[in-house]
Amino acid sequence: MIISSASDYREAARRRVPPFMFHYADGGSYAEQTLARNVSDLENIALRQRVLKDMSELDTSIELFGEKLSMPTILAPVGACGMYARRGEVQAAQAADNKGVPFTLSTVSICPIEEVAPAIKRPMWFQLYVLKDRGFMKNALERAKAAGCSTLVFTVDMPTPGARYRDMHSGMSGPYKEIRRVLQGFTHPFWAYDVGIKGKPHTLGNVSTYMGRQIGLDDYIGWLTENFDPSISWKDLEWIREFWEGPMVIKGILDPEDAKDAVRFGADGIVVSNHGGRQLDGVLSSARALPPIADAVKGDIKIIADSGIRNGLDIVRMLALGADATMLGRAFVYALGAEGRQGVENMLDIFKKEMHVAMTLTSNRTIADIKPEALVDLSKL
């Protein structure tokens, strides 16, 4: 099929990847209301077109935590990326590296830290959950430091997993999931050969290394559910702040008071995020939550936003709402599932071109120029 926009990659991935993996990325929790609002709330924000400005010199690059980024985005941590393309985390990291943006490796990646880090030139970011097994957390931090990871992304919005009903229907979980996955493999032969056979082992690399035994996809949900810690508080993170010397970003902030707590805690950044609508359904979209958070802490801490970003225009919208940078999750997973590394590189090129158009026609030469004035206040019309 012809790929002309990032949204085309979703359809391409739907065709190539078996349903249990496609819907794992595509779906949200409960009735998926927040998942839908993440996208629609961004789509409904009108950009303010300005013309007859000299836009011949336009720059999409930023500096974040001492790193130069070619555009204000980071590939977000996504679990089990190695099930979308052969050794998928390596391919996605190489694509990000080639395009000048960071890649964030998930705690529950297929490829372990030690496989991904040597495959790229720039330091990757590493994401960690708060888990009951503090020994695993310390081990993961030590390995991330040894591999040269530059920034720690600490996900705090999963003290308990959300109810993802779509996974029950697709075969990711639910009755007869093993046989359903096998049957889906027969109907997706290219994926079955490229990923299912040549992409082995299909284990959670970071977890398996620590446990000394293979933790596979069938154990994935169970291991996470068993190890999520609903008792966590800011105090539990203090030892991590002392242990981790590099930049630390708290992911999963939706309330201004929590953002202020992150500043008091000493975090270097936050990610305004509802986990892509995969945790608590019915919460605010990130686009709605972002402006009051920016009002509360802008300038005191770096603000990254994710959830619902589907094109380069959405990146500009998030920046105008108060973000310093953005994270892309589903968008890159669709591209990875469709075309591997080349797909992710092409997707990033598309996003950058779309940003160029949006910045040119809103008369913003640099990322720092993008302010709330780049948006139309529809309440006054």
Swiss-Prot record:
Purpose of the protein: Catalyzes the conversion of L-lactate to pyruvate. Is coupled to the respiratory chain.
UniProt cross-references to SUPFAM superfamilies, sorted A to Z: FMN-linked oxidoreductases
EC number(s) given by UniProt: 1.1.-.-
Alphabetic keyword roster: Cell inner membrane, Cell membrane, Flavoprotein, FMN, Membrane, Oxidoreductase
Compartments, as annotated in UniProt: Cell inner membrane
A GO molecular function held by the record: L-lactate dehydrogenase activity
Residues where FMN binds: 106, 127, 155, 251, 306-330
Residues of the FMN hydroxy acid dehydrogenase domain: 1-380
Catalytic residues (UniProt): H275 (proton acceptor)
Catalytic reaction list: (S)-lactate + A = pyruvate + AH2
Main location: membrane
Organism of derivation: Haemophilus influenzae (strain ATCC 51907 / DSM 11121 / KW20 / Rd)
PROSITE patterns recorded: FMN_HYDROXY_ACID_DH_1, FMN_HYDROXY_ACID_DH_2
Name of the encoding gene: lldD
Lineage: Bacteria, Pseudomonadati, Pseudomonadota, Gammaproteobacteria, Pasteurellales
Family the UniProt entry places it in: Belongs to the FMN-dependent alpha-hydroxy acid dehydrogenase family.
EC category name: oxidoreductase
Protein name listed in UniProt: L-lactate dehydrogenase
GO biological process: aerobic respiration; lactate metabolic process
Protein's membrane topology: Peripheral membrane protein
